[in-house]
Design a protein with these regions (language model features):
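A short, Lys/Arg-rich alpha-helix, primarily the initiator
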Residues: 1-18
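Short alpha-helical DNA-recognition segment
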Residues: 16-35
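Short, basic-rich loop-to-helix N-cap that marks the start of a DNA-contacting helix
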Residues: 40-53
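Small-residue (primarily alanine) positions within well-ordered alpha-helices
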Residues: 5, 23-26, 52
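The DNA-recognition helices of helix-turn-helix-type DNA-binding domains
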Residues: 29, 40, 66-69
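Short, charged recognition helix plus adjacent turn
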Residues: 10, 16, 35, 53, ...
Length: 70
C-alpha cells in the first residue's frame, strides 16, 4: 500500500466521506477510485491535486507519514 493510498483511505474514513462523492469531485469514476484504494490502479501524479481537493486537504497531507508523525 502506498503512502498516498493509505492517507486517502484514512482521510475518507475520518471525514466519513462517501467514496462515490469523492470520485465525482475528483473527476474520476467510482470504479477508478475503488481500484486506487484497493491497490489495483496506480495513482498518477496528475490525479493527486484532484484527489486532495476531493477530500478537502492540502496536497502535502496525502504524502504525510502519519505513523512517523511527519
Amino acid at each position: 500500500m502506498t503512502l498516498v493510498q493509505a492517507n486517502l483511505i484514512r482521510i475518507i474514513d475520518e471525514k466519513d466521506l462517501k467514496k462515490k462523492g469523492v470520485a465525482r469531485r475528483a473527476g474520476i469514476t467510482a470504479q477508478t477510485l475503488s481500484d486506487i484504494l484497493m491497490g489495483r490502479r496506480v495513482i498518477r501524479a496528475d490525479m493527486v491535486p484532484a484527489l486532495a481537493s476531493a477530500v478537502d486537504v492540502p496536497i502535502p497531507e496525502l504524502f504525510r507519514d502519519v505513523e512517523k508523525g511527519a
